[in-house]
Amino acid sequence: METLSFEFPAGQPPRGRALVGCVGSGDLEVLIEPGLAGRLTINVQTSVNGAEQRWQHLFARMFDGTTPPAMAIDIHDFGATPGVVRLRLEQGFEEIGHD
């Protein structure tokens, strides 16, 4: 089990919160809450040791060149594929946009 932390530049915090997925369904749960202005923080608890570079590349592809809202994202992973991670994150972003 590893705990990883990532940070990216961001804009203003959203008003909404979201919880998508669950560890038993697709092996991934994502919790999204408003963060501190200017910072997007991501904490990942994963059962896959040695995968930090994979996570870093996934987040870089999603957030480089954009200004996402300032969010605090917690991910609980039990071996999800990068495609499932991206899907769950996009579902969460859609949910916070509905507030």
Curated annotation (Swiss-Prot):
User: Which domain of life does the UniProt lineage start with?
Assistant: Bacteria
Task: State its location(s).
Answer: Cytoplasm
Q: Molecular function terms in GO for this entry? A: acyl carrier activity
Transmembrane regions listed in the UniProt entry: none
Q: Which InterPro entries match?
A: Mal_deCO2ase/Cit_lyase_ACP, Malonate_deCO2ase_dsu
Q: What's noted about post-translational modification?
A: Covalently binds the prosthetic group of malonate decarboxylase.
Its chief place of residence is cytoplasm
Which Gene Ontology CC terms are recorded?
Answer: cytoplasm
Kindly list the positions at which O-(phosphoribosyl dephospho-coenzyme A)serine occurs in this protein: 25
Q: Which UniProt keywords apply?
A: Cytoplasm, Phosphoprotein
Similarity annotation: Belongs to the MdcC family.
Function field? Subunit of malonate decarboxylase, it is an acyl carrier protein to which acetyl and malonyl thioester residues are bound via a 2'-(5''-phosphoribosyl)-3'-dephospho-CoA prosthetic group and turn over during the catalytic mechanism.
- Tell me the protein's name: Malonate decarboxylase acyl carrier protein
- Species in which this protein is naturally found: Pseudomonas fluorescens (strain Pf0-1)
